Amino acid sequence: MLFLLSPAKKLDYDTPVHVEHHTQPLFVEQSAALIKVLKTLSADDVAALMSLSPALAELNVARYAAWSRKFTQHNARQAVLAFNGDVYEGLQAGSLSPARLDWAQEHVAILSGLYGVLRPLDLMQPYRLEMGTRLATPKGKNLYEFWGSTIADYLNERLAGQKTPIVVNLASEEYFKSVDLKVLKARVVQCVFQDWKNGAWKVISFHAKRARGLMARYAIEHKVAKPEGLQKFDSEGYAFDASASSADKLVFRRKA
């Protein structure tokens, strides 16, 4: 069973990392091809394409210029420790033991606009390139066309040999769209997190993102091997709601 996560825009390359173990990213050739295109853009182009402030656009132009095919602990860090948005505040990878991070390495995959798929301990150089960005490349008009079936093919490889291949989707719609479902040979289980607001159950983006990270941590800590094992998830007040769920859609709810 593989758990899919979105990346984060917020990055942390300052906090000291607590593990030495790292691996090399898998799709460096594809990343290099994207960087080549990104290097042709001015800061104004980047600001317009990605709706960034001038300062953030300049920062990312500098990142693209500095990007190297060679990943070391000097220019990169493990992806799961570099990402720092809502999902990763829920996951809190910095407090996972090396043994638990090793389990995550085998069971978690992080989708990425620039890197395609990252394993948690893959080294990652800093970047900004969301999957929904309309970046034209020789392969098409956006990143979905650039990645094509690559991500689904990779997930199939990872799941090959498993009796019942299952992908647990903890990624956002923007990122999960990069997985070609016509190519993917696995059952997909969705996790939905809802909060009670104004008299109704609603998916509230900030809370749902954090909850996806909390669920990933729960799976890592409990070495969850079957979707049913996720039903006991109860972090930060969430509880499984069987009546709102189906076999492939697990709904977790909480009242404030």
From Swiss-Prot:
Belongs to the UPF0246 family. One of its GO terms (cellular component) is cytosol. This is UPF0246 protein Bpet1601. InterPro entries: YaaA. The lineage of its organism: Bacteria, Pseudomonadati, Pseudomonadota, Betaproteobacteria, Burkholderiales. GO terms for biological process: response to hydroperoxide. Signal peptide: none annotated. It comes from the Bacteria.
